[in-house]
């Protein structure tokens, strides 16, 4: 394509678009047309994201509506078949050099914007970073900052014209267009989800069938995907390849490292839409939301008590069985809960990586730090539904609720007397200890 004169005025979509005539368009096969669509939509999205377009070009409207986007307006001199063939081949060359997410046309957009004193994201070189007021995360580019904020607001401004599904960012919409373009041919009949690869489709179907063909030879636990099995096996081998740059703590899974790093950054991107409380990971906010719904699907067969999480039920059942499966190799002490065991091990190492920014006090566990920080903020997020009393810790609420229910789960083995709190049972046992001491004397 003939070189264009350097653009002096505002950048327009026409400066970075490629136009095909009707004859040229008919020479394109389905894959080439789909590629053209992706490239044009991405270039349009780039210009919109930096505020260089105020109206939607006709070409984009045609693409979104599924119409043929050819035009009779010519950029090239005409007159011979050789010239026309040259122009068509030049246009095709630009498209063939494209990839799914970054195209040669996009590079032209980038170079023109840089000539205007802007970087690829539309910032001048003297502009400052962008900080999110919700979670404190800092972004180099304004477009990344705007896209991130939608995690907090749940805004989905990018809507598919064909099926109506909306997305938070233009890249997700572009990826979704592949469904309609036939680039994601595997459709799940259970939930309607489209998948690009056959292997991904097979793994996805196991969610519905609950098939778990990959078995751990150490403990017998089964998994849907081989990658999850390999990650699980690190529990047995002790391998922890993912290390935190801030405190040096290592993890078996990359996802666990990502969650841990949010402790240092303070980022809590997952927000409860009921009370506004923010969390570091999605699974925690889902569990938290059961507080509002009152859902407790996991019930103890021994006492009938119900729980929001299956893991809490398993831990609770150890009160009935007396099982303490976590043993400290340093001192021989045993624990009912893995969290208690992990916290205990830090007493031997003396490591307290979680420090309060307000008073400097350090803790062995992040959960203890979170609870401690409520002393400074005055936050009491756990409310009793019976009387409205609020507590800093969930354990305080649980103990308080026993006043209303009359539950006394802590029983003395010597006299059978029961108590609502473990501390009350410990205090009571001193009576028996004193009685035994008096008998001995």
Curated annotation (Swiss-Prot):
This protein's UniProt keywords = DNA-binding, Metal-binding, Nucleus, Repeat, Transcription, Transcription regulation, Zinc, Zinc-finger
SMART domains to which the protein is assigned, alphabetical: KRAB (SM00349), ZnF_C2H2 (SM00355)
Question: What span is annotated as the signal peptide, if there is one?
Answer: none
Subcellular location field: Nucleus
Q: Which residues form the KRAB domain?
A: 11-82
Where is it found, in Gene Ontology cellular component terms? nucleus
Q: Name one GO molecular function term.
A: DNA-binding transcription activator activity, RNA polymerase II-specific
**What is its biological role?**
May be involved in transcriptional regulation.
Q: Which family does it belong to?
A: Belongs to the krueppel C2H2-type zinc-finger protein family.
Q: What is this protein called?
A: Zinc finger protein 485
Q: Give the organism, scientific name.
A: Homo sapiens
* Protein encoded by which gene: ZNF485
């Amino acid at each position: 394509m003939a070189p264009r004169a350097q653009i002096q005025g505002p950048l327009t979509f026409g400066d970075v678009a490629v136009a095909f005539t009707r004859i040229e368009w008919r020479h394109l096969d389905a894959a080439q047309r789909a590629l053209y669509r992706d490239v044009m939509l991405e270039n349009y999205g780039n210009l919109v994201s930096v505020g260089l377009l105020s109206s939607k070009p006709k070409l984009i409207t045609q693409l979104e509506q599924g119409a043929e986007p050819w035009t009779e307006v010519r950029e090239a001199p005409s007159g011979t078949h050789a010239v026309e063939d040259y122009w068509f081949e030049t246009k095709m060359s630009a498209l063939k050099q494209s990839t799914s997410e970054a195209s040669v046309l996009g590079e032209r957009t980038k170079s023109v914007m840089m000539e205007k004193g802007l970087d690829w994201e539309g910032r001048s070189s003297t502009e400052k970073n962008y900080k999110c007021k919700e979670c404190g995360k800092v972004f180099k580019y304004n477009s990344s900052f705007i896209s991130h904020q939608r995690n907090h607001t749940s805004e989905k401004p990018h809507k598919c014209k064909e099926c109506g599904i909306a997305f938070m960012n233009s890249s997700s919409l572009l990826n979704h267009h592949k469904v309609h373009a036939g680039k994601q041919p595997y459709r799940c009949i259970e939930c309607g989800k489209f998948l690009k690869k056959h292997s991904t489709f097979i793994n996805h179907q196991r969610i519905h069938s609950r098939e778990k063909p990959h078995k751990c030879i150490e403990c017998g636990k089964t998994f849907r995907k081989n990658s999850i099995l390999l990650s699980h096996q690190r529990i047995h081998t002790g391998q922890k390849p993912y290390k935190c740059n801030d405190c040096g703590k290592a993890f078996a899974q990359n996802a666990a490292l990502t969650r841990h790093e949010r402790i240092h950054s303070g980022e809590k991107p997952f927000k409860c839409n009921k009370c506004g409380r923010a969390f570091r990971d999605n699974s925690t906010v889902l569990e938290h939301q059961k507080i509002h719904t009152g859902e407790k699907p996991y019930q103890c067969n021994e006492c009938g008590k119900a729980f929001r999480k299956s893991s809490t039920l398993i831990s609770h059942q150890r009160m009935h069985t007396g099982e303490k499966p976590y043993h400290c190799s340093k001192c021989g002490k045993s624990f009912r809960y893995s969290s208690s065991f992990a916290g205990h091990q830090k007493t031997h190492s003396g490591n307290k990586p979680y420090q309060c920014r307000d008073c400097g006090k350090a803790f062995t566990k992040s959960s203890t730090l979170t609870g401690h920080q409520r002393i400074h903020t005055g936050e009491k997020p756990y409310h009793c539904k019976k009387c409205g009393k609020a507590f800093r810790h969930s354990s305080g609420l649980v103990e308080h609720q026993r006043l209303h229910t009359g539950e006394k789960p802590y029983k003395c083995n010597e006299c059978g007397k029961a108590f609502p709190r473990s501390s009350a049972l410990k205090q009571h046992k001193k009576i028996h200890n004193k009685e035994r001491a008096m008998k001995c004397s």
